[in-house]
Amino acid sequence: MSAQQFYGDKGYAPAPPQQAYGGPNYYPPQQNYPQQGYAPPQGYPQGGYPAQQPMYVQQPQASDPGGDLCCGLLTGLACCCCLDAMF
C-alpha cells in the first residue's frame, strides 16, 4: 500500500524527512582531544587505578550471649504495649 492509497486525496501526506540544522557538516571538527583513547591520570600505574582491598570490620562480641535475646524480647513487648495503648 502506498502513501497515496493510505491517505487518499484528503490532503494528508507524510511530512518530508527533516534535515539536520546546517547540513552534515554542522558540528566543527574536534580539536585538542587525544585521538588514541584514554590515558590514566599521572601518579597511577599504567594499568589504571589500583584494585581496592575489601575492608572487614570486626563486630564487638557480646559478653552475655543471652542479652541480645532478652533485649529483643523486651523491645517486642514494648512495641506491642505501645500498639495496644494507641488502639
Swiss-Prot record:
State if Cell cycle is listed as a keyword: no
Residues covered by region (Disordered): 1-64
Stretches assigned to coiled coil? none
Induction annotation: By UV light, alkylating agents and heat shock.
Assigned keywords, A-Z:
Cell membrane, Lipoprotein, Membrane, Stress response
Modifications made to the protein after synthesis: Palmitoylated.
Membrane-topology descriptor: Lipid-anchor
Give the CC-aspect GO terms. Answer: cell division site; cell tip; plasma membrane
Q: Which InterPro entries match?
A: CYSTM_dom
Renumbered to this chain, the Low complexity biased-composition regions fall at: 18-41
Q: Quick check: keyword Lipoprotein in the entry?
A: yes
Q: Where in the cell is it found?
A: Cell membrane; Cell tip
Q: What is this protein called?
A: Lipid-anchored plasma membrane protein uvi15
Lineage, highest ranks first: Eukaryota, Fungi, Dikarya, Ascomycota, Taphrinomycotina
Annotated gene: uvi15
